[in-house]
Every structure is written in C-alpha cells, then in structure tokens.
UniProtKB/Swiss-Prot annotation, chains A, B, C, D:
Domain of life according to the entry: Bacteria
Protein name: GTP cyclohydrolase FolE2
Lineage: Bacteria, Thermotogati, Thermotogota, Thermotogae, Kosmotogales
Reaction equation(s) it catalyzes: GTP + H2O = 7,8-dihydroneopterin 3'-triphosphate + formate + H(+)
Residues annotated as site: May be catalytically important: C144
Similarity remark: Belongs to the GTP cyclohydrolase IV family.
Pathway assignment: Cofactor biosynthesis; 7,8-dihydroneopterin triphosphate biosynthesis; 7,8-dihydroneopterin triphosphate from GTP: step 1/1
Enzyme Commission designation: 3.5.4.16
Length: 257, 257, 257, 257
C-alpha cells in the first residue's frame, strides 16, 4: 500500500507540532504513600515534521505509548519522548498528560479520613535536553480581607483553585506541593468534615483572610525557599461568592511585565 | 435524486425523537425593560418518526427555524413547533433553546450599574396541546447556617446556582423569577460592587444564613403563592467553599418520593 | 454543638432530593476480562427529606460511600443505598456514578492491541424496590446513506456517540453492550489502526451506510432480542462532518409520543 | 472605610497579572456586511501589580469595561487598555475576549441561506506598545488522503476545527479569514444543505483529500501571501471519525523547534 504520509511535500513549510490529542489511556503514577496509583491520563503527543514530508504516522504515537506499560513517571516520560523521536524520525517530541490524583486526608479535628481529588499533569519536551514540568491544581478556601475589614460581621469567602506549575532540580512530591499551597491559603478544604472540623475551618479561615494576590505571593514565598524548585508559575482563580466571575492572580518566575 | 430518507422502513420501530442538536443561532427574546434583546440560542429541534419511514429530513429543521426571523417568544415557539410538524409530517415536535440573558442591575448602596448574565431557556413541545417551560439559572450567595451557629466568628459561604423551571398560566418575566430567587437566598450577587456595597452584601448574607434546603423551600414558597405559576421544579447547587463538591437540593411540584 | 439541620422546619415543604453532587472518588468496577478495574467515579448521592426537618447531614453521604471500600457493583450499589437510607433516616435514596472504563481491543486486520475508553455509569434508586440502570456511551463511525446514494464518489461520514441505558433481568457486561452497539453502526472505531486496518474500516463502513435513525433502530433490534434486557433507552448523536451541529435520534422502550 | 488593597505589601513580590476572569458582557463587534453585530463576550481583564501594593481594585475593571458602551473593536480595545492602566495605576494591561460571531452563508448549489456560528476572539496587551491578535475558529471538512488512497471505495472524513491567530498590519475581516481557511480544507461546511448541496460537498471534498498537516500548510500559504498579515499561528484539530481522539497540527510563524 502506498505510504502517502512519507511522500515529498513541496510547500516548503515545516510543521512545529503534529500528532494526536485528547487520547485517554489508563496510567500508573507514583504515590508517596502507596508507591503506585492507578489513574486515567489524557494525552497530547506531538513531534515536529520537517518541510520535506507530507505527514506524520499517527498510529505510531499510540504504539509508543502503549509499549510503556502505562507507567508515567518523569524518567518514563523521557523514555516515551525518545521513543517518539525515533519512531517518527523527529527532532523534538512533546508529551503532556493530565490526570486526577487522589490523596487520603484526615479531617483536622475529628481525624476522619476520606479521599480528595486533585487535577495534576506533566508537560514534557525533548529536543537536545529534556524538560519536565509538574502541574498541580489545589482547591482551597479564601476569605476576603477587604470584606472582613469593612463589615461589622462575617466576611465573604469561596473556593479558589490554585494552579501551579514547577520545574524541579530534584523530586518534589505532589503531596508536598499540595501542602505548601494549602498552607498559603485561608484554609485547606476537605471532602469530609464533621461539625467540629467545620467549626475549626471556619474560624481558621476567618483568622487568615487572603486575597488571590496574597495566596499567589504566599505560594511563591514557599517555592522560592525550596531549593528543589527551579522555576514556578502560580495562578489563583477565586470563584467569588459575591460575583458571577473569578478573581485572578498570576506570578511566573523570571517573567517581567 | 433518490430520497433515501422517505423509503419504507421494515424494522417496525417508531423513533421517539429525531432531529438536530446543538445548533447555535442568533435570536431575539423579549426584555422587560428594553422590549427586545439580541442574544444567541443553542437549539435542539426534534420530531417523532413513524415506524414506516427510514429517516427524517434534517435540513427542514433549519429552514423552519430560519423562517421565523430569529424571534423566540412563547407564541413564536408554538408557531415553530407547528411548522416543524407540517414540514416533517410529524405528530409531535420538541424545541429546546438555551440562551444567555443580560439584565442591568444597580449595586445596592452605591447604585452603580452593570450587566449581569443569566443562563435561560425554553423547553417546548406540541402534540395535541402546546407545553411551554421557562428555565432560569440564578447565581446567588449562600451563608451556611450550621457554620455560623457553631463557629465563634465567621461562617463559610459560597456562590450557589439556583436552576428553576416553571410552567405558567400567564406571563412571568425572567426578571421576576430572578427577583424571587434572589430574595430566597442569603443575598443576591452583582457584577460590580463598590466597597460600601460589599459591606452591605457581606452583612445581609451573614444575617440570613441559608442551607440549599432553605433556598429551595423559600423559592417554592414564593412560587406557590404566585397564581401565574402552575408548576415548578427548583434545584439549588451550592459550590461549597469548604469542599470540592456541591451541596444539592431539588423540589418538584407534584412529585412524590 | 447545636444540630441546626435537625431542627424542626415549619415551611411544610418536603424536599424530593437533597445531598451531594459532583464528588470524585476512586472506585473499582467489575471487568469481564480482568475481574476488576480501577477507575474514577463522579458521584451524586441524594435522599429525600421530610417536611419536618430543616436539613440533611451532608457529611454522612461521604462516610457511607467511603465505608464501601470503593467497590461499585450492582449489588454494592444497593448496599450503599440501604446504608444511606439508614444513616440519613430517609425513605428514598438515589446514587448515580459516571466513570471511564477501558477495554483492550485488537485492530481488525493487524490484530495490534490498544486501550479504548468508554464513558459508563450507573443510575440507582432504592425506595421499596431497588432500581438499577447501566449507562454506556459508545463512539462509532456512521457513513451517511443519502450522501453515498446521491454522490458520484465518496460519502460523508463522522464519529457518532451512541448513549444507551438498560435495565437488566440478569447481568449484561459493558463489553457486550459495546459489541451490540458497534455491530449496529457503519463500523466500530479503534484507538490504534495500521494502514491495512484503516482500509478495512473505510471499506466496511462505506458498505454499511447508516443514518442516526438506522443506528438507533439496529441497536433496539439487538436489545429487543436479548431476554436479559428488560428496558432500554438509545440515543445517537452524530457529529455531522458537513455541519457544525449534531444529528440525533432517540428510542425509549415503552414510551409513546 | 479602610482600603486594604492599597496597603503596603512587604513580601517584595510583584504580580505579573491580576484582575477578573470569565466575565460575560454584551458587546457589539464590527460586521463586514451589516456594519455591527450584537454578541456576547467572555472577558479576562488583567493588569500588573507592583511589589509594593497588597491588592488591585477589582471593581474598577468592570467600571472601565462598562464605560465603553459595549463596543469592541481593535481601536476600542486599545482605549480600554489605556483606561485600565490609568484606573489601576498599572504599567501593563491585558484584555482577552471570546465571542460567537454569525455569518449568513448561502449553500453552494441551491443558494439557500442560513447562519453559521464561529468562535472568535481578541487578545490584546498594552505596555509601551499596543499588541492585538485576532482569533477565529473555523469548522471545516477533511477527507483523509491515506484512507482514500488505500481503500477500494470511500474515504474516512470528519469535522475539523481550524484555530487561527493573526497579527495584522491592516484590517483583515473575520469573513476573509474564514474564506481563506475554508479554501484550505477538503470542503467548507454549512448549517443548511439541500440534497444537491450535499452531493456537491461530498464530491468536492472527496476530490480534495487533506491531512491536518495539509490544511495547516495550505492556510499558512495563504497567510504568507497576504501582506496585511504580519504573524500567524495555525492549529488544526481533526475529530477523527475512525478514532476517539483528535489528529493535530500546529504552525507558528517565527517559531523554530
């Protein structure tokens, strides 16, 4: 059968990224407590395509991924990228994967356990060097400092999503990132809280009011002081309870205006 | 050209609903203040198909809709349904449309104006009789009564979405539904609030703590006492600030367990 | 601490459903090939609330779910529902759960294996009796019979999503539902296809053109003839390649116009 | 009342972007045929925040936007950005807005008219200079060249989304971008097609098979040859009818590997 993709292209235009997008695949990721966790990845797998070829070979992306037995670790990502470059005769390879990650947490006073879900992901590229970014989304509670200050009673508060991306010099567990982010908010949130826990979270959060600006800076302070973290991007989106839109703040290391 | 759709089907299975889904079309709806409002509808247009025919004629759904000059009112919906039944030789026709609707609201103390957006919709059917349901989604603020009661200071609160559906004996404006729902919550929410407004909303909501159960019942009380409303379904989903899931309550008129 | 939820409510309005929504939790479901499959559930857990009580106890829903060790089978669902009714002193309990489910499939000619992902779910209720519905979403290929008939060459085709719900007299595997649905379409689809497989799927689908009406009827024919299936609802949504909207057909057993 | 936001911050960390996100507002955009089109914008409005201030003033973003009477043109965007910088004492301002845009198109043979919807947007920044990017998403039809070549009959095809971003030296209408993109695909798609139109589109597309790689290159060829376009990014995502994931290609001007 003719290999249409391998035919010469005369338009003289290289393609930056080509491949498959939105592929769901079962994966196994590292878990600090249980060593391994089964979860579900949503993958984008891309390579570059030189100007001389008409198309890439889409089926090979799946073959490479499938060959790695579902293991998705930083080390494994580099191996997937190398295999993609070889299988597709490419110079650069890109793999991103998003996955839900579960942690068993105990309520702060009652100690009762339950699972909390975090949207995590990896962004990786291999050209000459291997680049790897860890993404973690942490839901937290933010109490508005302005509302607390100007009101005779109460203070508006809400769930906020903190999206962090980090490059690392050495391993930082997802669990550690979550702890740092929760520590930077008005209070952490939980799947299961009994009444005594709810009282505690309500009071702690009221005592620690935080704007989205505060949360982003507090996370950055913690990341700056961790020598394992070489780069970070921190975004905070607060689902304002008094509005139907979000408040947002973003700090990226090394980015000027 | 052969009309494959009109060919006889021998499988002896009537189809309950067939047509097109997810069609975006510019529309004009009634506006209490400005008479008319331009907005964007997302339509589902379905009819039944008797067991004897292989297929419906999809293009006619668009032709019927387009012929009505974008006007979407209760009266107009019935006319669209009648035209669909005729154009497609059907017994029953169904049209649902969802659209964002904007209202200019003034902040409670400063009086400054801004637009608020509400997801609205119509669900309509014509068999022998014409059935019409108005849908309105109203974002509100809910302060947790339990959290307030058990805590020495503060109370967790959050944005909650109140989804109501009503059948009417006579016209009820979208604006009236929104006012009834906002009145049933801890406080209304706004796109633009200056500091004095934020203080007001914070204190008012703290003085009116409401569970999702309370909000649903308070809305129902208002609907029960409005003779124009003959049927209702009220759903409240609160984006709990202390959890990463929603609290939910639903009351439907005439529904037992 | 005061139990605000248990206080008497004087509004005299029972609530049909109250509980938690959108809770993500790790689960284990039955797998025809491997006995068990780890996946991720998104849960809604509701009970009724009599007119005399102000609120339900939201934390107990999570406690009940957590106590079942993540197992989600039809039998286990009934046990969760019973526990919810007891823990929350309710008459009726409702649990819905949606989850991705993976099946290893071999390409039709090359035989190469890969995982395919299917969105599945359970809808269950316990009042006096236990009611259980299995949901499966199957992506398939549909070639338009009209386009093929009237065109001198080619025929437009596209991915279509077939959403089925079934009530069962005895166990039907998710895998069996998928096979019946794929058999009813122009062709099944795969995550990984080599060139010889792509040729096969292209030709097979061209030889079996199917409207959404055809697919829905063909699925129903297979379900009618399976004594294990006591009720079904079949929806087909075709992501029309020549339009930016969907074609849709729906057949529900026992539903008249 | 105390202005908490204006207080001095001692953490010494400037914030790259702070403001509001996901704000829906009614807007009026330019329309080549009808001069003006009412539509609905979803806005992100951000500024930078120097290290010395604790917070920005969120309400002023809405005030600035509201003051511009809903007009959203390139010229107007610069004015919004300037007003944001002044109102918030910022150095840089960012505004992005996404909106649906409708065009009346006539079917290729029958000539019957209907509206097609396109997701469009603007990305604008003002620091010392004003930067403006136009985004347009164009759904098209792609027939797979490989499938056509290797199969004895038929060829798999599908809806593909072409997302383009352009910077301009002088005005390029959204309508012109759409025409260039449709011309680069196997065939354009329409909301309403009668049988003779469907035959035409089926045959034209079969005669013009295009990979995602082909479509991206063909769009780039057209953009390279238009002196009004100074920069482009072209992404093509094809909703593969034989898979449950997308095929993807991306070319960005000036980007190396």
């Amino acid at each position: 059968m003719r290999d249409v993709q391998s035919e010469k292209d005369h338009r003289n235009i290289p393609i930056n990224m080509v491949g498959i997008k939105g592929l769901k695949y079962p994966i196994i990721v590292m878990d600090r407590t249980n060593k391994r966790q089964h979860t579900i990845g949503t993958f984008n797998l891309f390579v570059d395509l030189p100007k001389d070829f008409r198309g890439t070979h889409m089926s090979r992306f799946v073959e490479v991924l499938d060959r790695h037995n579902m293991k998705v670790t930083p080390k494994n990502m580099e191996s997937i990228l190398d295999d993609m470059r070889e299988a597709l005769k490419a110079t650069v390879a890109h793999v991103t994967v998003d996955f839900p990650y579960f942690i068993r947490k105990n309520a702060p006073i009652s100690g009762i356990g339950s699972y909390s879900s975090y949207n995590c992901g990896f962004i990786s590229t291999k050209n000459k060097e291997f680049d790897f970014i860890l993404k973690v989304e942490v839901p937290v509670l933010t109490v508005c400092p302005c509302s607390k200050e100007i009101s005779d009673r109460g203070a508006h508060n809400q769930r906020a999503m903190v999206n962090v991306q980090v490059r690392m010099n050495s391993l930082v567990w997802i669990e550690e990132i979550i702890e740092m982010v929760e520590d930077a908010a008005s209070a952490p949130i939980f799947t299961l809280l009994k009444r005594e826990d709810e009282k505690f979270i309500t009071e702690v959060s009221y005592d620690n009011p935080r704007f989205v600006e505060d949360v982003s800076r507090e996370v950055v302070l913690r990341f700056m002081n961790d020598p394992r973290i070489s780069w970070y991007r921190v975004e905070v989106s607060s689902q304002e309870s008094i509005h139907n839109h979000e408040a947002y703040a973003c700090i990226e290391k090394g980015k000027s205006l």
